[in-house]
């Protein structure tokens, strides 16, 4: 196994670990999920560039008769990228004491202010940062508001 293959294996394991954690780990941490809201997908251009670069690397490796293991690892990385960026639906998961957003846990008592922007983005001001929550369905904003008001 070359250094390139080792780096690819590390990236594949990291992305696979993130996908499993995001899909099933956040579902089980900090108690039962009381409200799950789908979010808009972001970074389409970045994901297209990354997937395209992986495809170019696969083509280059095949054209130059590179190692078969490298081709398979690049293919696995490409499939993981397609799943993470194009198939998986990002979600915000509300629990009894807080919520998961972008893989991070936020307790309700850290929310200092909530505002709704003109374009339908829920802005939550936390102690040290601001969260921009873009929901897929605009009606979900009302569900989020009522859930937070009733559960604090």
UniProtKB/Swiss-Prot annotation:
Cited InterPro entries: DUF986
Record keywords: Cell inner membrane, Cell membrane, Membrane, Transmembrane, Transmembrane helix
The keyword Aminoacyl-tRNA synthetase is assigned to this record: no
Principal location class: membrane
An example Gene Ontology CC term for this record: plasma membrane
Lineage of origin: Bacteria, Pseudomonadati, Pseudomonadota, Gammaproteobacteria, Enterobacterales
This protein's name: UPF0266 membrane protein ESA_01432
Annotated family: Belongs to the UPF0266 family.
Membrane topology (UniProt): Multi-pass membrane protein
Domain of life (superkingdom): Bacteria
UniProt-annotated location(s): Cell inner membrane
HAMAP family linked: UPF0266 (MF_01071)
Transmembrane segments: 1-21, 45-65, 67-87
Organism encoding this protein: Cronobacter sakazakii (strain ATCC BAA-894)
């Amino acid at each position: 196994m070359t250094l390139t293959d080792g780096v690819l294996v590390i990236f594949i394991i990291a992305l696979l670990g993130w996908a499993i954690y995001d899909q099933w780990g956040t579902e089980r941490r900090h108690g039962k999920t009381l409200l799950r809201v789908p979010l808009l997908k972001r970074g389409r251009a970045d994901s297209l560039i990354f997937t395209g670069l992986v495809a170019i690397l696969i083509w280059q490796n095949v054209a130059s008769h590179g190692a078969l293991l490298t081709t398979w690892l690049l293919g696995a990385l490409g499939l993981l990228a397609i799943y993470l960026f194009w198939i998986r639906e990002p979600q915000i998961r509300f629990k009894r004491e807080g919520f998961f957003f972008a893989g991070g846990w936020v307790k309700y008592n850290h929310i200092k202010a909530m505002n709704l922007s003109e374009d339908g983005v829920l802005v939550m001001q936390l102690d040290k940062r601001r969260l921009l929550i873009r929901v897929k369905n605009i009606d979900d904003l009302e569900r989020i508001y009522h859930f937070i008001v009733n559960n604090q």
